[in-house]
Amino acid sequence: MHRYKKEASNLIKLATPVLIASVAQTGMGFVDTVMAGGVSATDMAAVSVAASIWLPSILFGIGLLMALVPVVAQLNGAGKREQVPFEIQQGAVMALLISIPIIGVLFQTQWILGYMNVDAVMATKTIGYIHAVMFAVPAFLLFQTLRSLTDGLSLTKPAMVIGFIGLLLNIPLNWMFVYGKLGAPALGGVGCGVATAIVYWIMFLLLLFYVTTSHRLRQVQLFTTFHPPQLNAQVKLFKLGFPVAAALFFEVTLFAVVALLVAPLGSTVVAAHQVAINFSSLVFMLPMSIGAATSIRVGHMLGEKSTEGARIASHVGILVGLSTAVFTALLTVILREQIALLYTDNRVVITLAMQLLIFTAIYQCTDAIQVIAAGALRGYKDMRAIFNRTFIAYWLLGLPTGYVLGLTDWIVEPMGAQGFWIGFIVGLSSAAAMLGVRLHWLHRQNDEIQLNYEAR
């Protein structure tokens, strides 16, 4: 029991800065939504649709680079910090390379919106937002590379501080470019994209300054020796990161595709859907931060060749995450009207958003289990298991269920947005079950097999 309490303390110390950093980053989306909503419902809806295209694209790149966290954590646990600079420099190369196709995908926004029959005015604003924010792609991915370094070394506070600075900068920059203050043009929802691009470049430069000047990273000597790009290293990183990226892509696109499918239902439905999605993303930061901390702790324990420590870290992560999820689910149900009022004063939007917030409360517990179990499996570098199971859960179970219930009369009369949210519940709950079973299976293997996964 003492080891569990000690592990819980270590986990919370790691997870708290990750949580604050993640909330700050997601809070930027909240600020975008609220400020765009202050212009018009169409601007608010445009930001929602733009996020549905931007997030899956950029998060695929982030997923590739997330593989660096357990790599760094295991090297740190094994006392091999001298190997860390090579891995991070190769990660920076990967970040720049993957920026090219991501920007290429973002350039296809007009085609995507045309295919989805989105309203012309909303489409114009959405395209403007995407064209502005695509300039942030390299900065966003390079920031993630450096964050993989600090997080992997169990230094989660730097990203927290910089994330909070980014949020504080995003508010006045949005104010300037959305409403046309201090001589800036009044761009409406497009101004949110301009502000976001500026903020991400500032955040990258701040983290770069930290890792090159902090006395806590002197032993790492990140840029003392230049390591040229190596094809084998790039292939290895890609193979390790691709399943994580694909799994993250599957989950995010489950929400993003639904937002695009909901778009033709009108601005009111889109706005209510965006309220529920944005708040759900804020709440999701709790279990996601615990999952990230669990990944770090599992990786560190495996670096020390302690499979028992890795098992305890996994169990503690799930217990802590499930406890917080029960609490947030209850608060969501009780305060759903007040939550909706934070986003808009449109009563029609509020009424529909309150209904959708009930669905967010329902799946919070299973969502916590799936994201923390995935974090533990990342610590083991059991990436393929995450890939396979999330694909089945999100694309073969969740999305088809949502589509059938939301837009067809095959089972019941078309339920609209509510049907898609039932699909979310099915997908996330299925992922929780499958990933939880996989983690339990891994824990039952002997030490040699578990450490063999670690060595992959």
Swiss-Prot record:
Keywords attached to this entry: Antiport, Cell inner membrane, Cell membrane, Ion transport, Membrane, Sodium, Sodium transport, Transmembrane, Transmembrane helix, Transport
One Gene Ontology term, aspect cellular component: plasma membrane
Localization per Swiss-Prot or TrEMBL: Cell inner membrane
Domain of life: Bacteria
Transmembrane segments: 11-31, 53-73, 93-113, 126-146, 159-179, 189-209, 242-262, 276-296, 315-335, 356-376, 391-411, 417-437
Task performed by this protein: Multidrug efflux pump that functions as a Na(+)/drug antiporter.
Recorded family membership: Belongs to the multi antimicrobial extrusion (MATE) (TC 2.A.66.1) family.
Record protein name field: Multidrug resistance protein NorM
Organism: Vibrio vulnificus (strain CMCP6)
